Amino acid sequence: MMFILNYAVFFILMGLVPASSVQAHHSHSNYATTEYTHLEGKVTEFHWINPHTWIYIEVLDDQGKATVWALEGASPPELRRDGWRRDDVEVGDTIFVRCHQLKDRSNGCLLGFLTPEGGVEKEWD
């Protein structure tokens, strides 16, 4: 009986280990989630892939210099459930986003909301 109990405890604990690493993977602690950054830019790359979509946009800074921003988004299945389609965003499109910038203030964001040019703002996370 003790042998079976030991195995049961072992398998329960082993089941919890992957769950903790999955939660760590989905942490957004590297983003400043208490504030939004507003960006407008032209899409230079778009990756509709699991586990996260990625959009790269070229944004003009205050001096008119182009900088590239990396925008991390939700997974394709999540976005499809929210009404997004893969072809709603394409390279060359101008988009407007509200996102949570990286805490180190580099050019990266966790997408919150996206507005295609001439479209309606919708959640992207």
What are these regions (language model features)?
Residues 41-43:
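Conserved hydrophobic positions within beta-strands
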Residues 102-125:
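OB-fold/S1-family single-stranded nucleic acid-binding modules
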Residues 81-96:
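Short nucleic-acid-contacting surface segments enriched for D/E, G, S/T with interspersed K/R
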Residues 6-19:
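Bacterial N-terminal signal peptides
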Residues 49-59:
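Short aromatic-glycine-enriched beta-strand elements
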